Amino acid sequence: MKKILLILTLSIFSFASNLPINSVVKIFSTVSDQNYLEPWENPKIYNLTGSGAIIKDNRILTSAHVVSGANFVEVQKENDSKKYEATVKYISNDVDLAILEVNDKSFFANTKALEITEDVKIKDSVTAIG
C-alpha cells in the first residue's frame, strides 16, 4: 500500500513539473468608461484581471474581454512581482481573443512559448492553466 501511495505521489509531481507554468501570465487592464449622456461627469475607472499564454513571436494570447477598450495593459509572469507594459496588437470580440505585445523584450527571459496545434482529436486529454 505504501509503495502504491509513493508511486501515485511521485506521478502527480512528475505531471505537475511538465505543466507549462512559465508560459502562463497574469494580465491587468485599466478601462475608463465615459458617460456620453452626461459628458461633464468623470469617467468611471475599472481595473480588470485575467490570464494569458505566451505564444510564438513573443506575443501573448488572451481573452478579448480582458483587454477590450483598455487604456492601459500590464502583464506579469508567474512568481515575479514586476509588471511589464503591454499593448493590444490584435483583437476580435466575436471570438473573444486578443494578442498582446510586450514593450520590454526582457519579459520573455526564462519563458517558453506554448505550441498551438491544429491536430486535435475527440477524447484528447487537455489541461487548462490560467
How would you name each of these model-derived features?
Residues 16-54, 59-63, 72, 121-129:
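N-terminal activation segment of mature serine protease catalytic domains
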Residues 4-13:
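Sec-dependent N-terminal signal peptides
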Residues 15, 42-43, 88, 116:
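Short, flexible, glycine/charge-rich loop motifs used to bind or transfer phosphoryl groups or to couple energy/partner
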